[in-house]
Amino acid sequence: MGVFNYEVETPSVIPAARLFKSYVLDGDKLIPKVAPQAITSVENVEGNGGPGTIKNITFGEGSRYKYVKERVDEVDNTNFTYSYTVIEGDVLGDKLEKVCHELKIVAAPGGGSILKISSKFHAKGDHEINAEEMKGAKEMAEKLLRAVETYLLAHSAEYN
């Protein structure tokens, strides 16, 4: 089994604390509201949102995937970090055992922030994972970030 790493940084005009609160802590409710074409629902199957929680995420009709199950590994409200593992779903296909994601939101000059995502794709057997296959996760994260950002800019009193 090989592990393939992929890292991406996406800038945002939203301050780090506000982005973490909306995109991460309340993302289960906010993202289906602002990007229903991407994600229609997030349901806690087990747990209360903290480490060990299992979530079932249903993708929108336009997606090539139907669902994933994720396990929350860590939530750090002080350092704005969140890590989770995709443990089930058609997104894993026959090549992947799991995908581990670590998100960190850091302050950027000028009052905005940077969303840093580090992903580890754990392949089954001798399967190779190429950059093109990993790029889908980056594109999805960026689309969701932009949808949340647009919402926050239009609703300046929320998530402060």
Curated annotation (Swiss-Prot):
General remark: The sequence shown is that of clone Cor a I/5.
InterPro entries assigned: Bet_v_I/MLP, Bet_v_I_allergen, Plant_def-hormone_signal, START-like_dom_sf
Outcome following mutation: residue 15 to S: In clone COR A 1/16
Record note on what altering residue 11 to T does: In clone COR A 1/11
PROSITE patterns in UniProt: PATHOGENESIS_BETVI (PS00451)
Any one GO molecular-function label of the UniProt entry: signaling receptor activity
Family per similarity comment: Belongs to the BetVI family.
A biological-process GO annotation: abscisic acid-activated signaling pathway
Stretch forming the signal peptide: none
Name by which UniProt lists this protein: Major pollen allergen Cor a 1 isoforms 5, 6, 11 and 16
An annotated GO cellular component: nucleus
Taxonomic superkingdom: Eukaryota
UniProt xrefs under SMART domains: Bet_v_1
UniProt keyword annotations, A-Z: Allergen, Pathogenesis-related protein, Plant defense
UniProt effect for mutating residue 114 to T: In clone COR A 1/16
A Pfam family recorded for this sequence: Bet_v_1
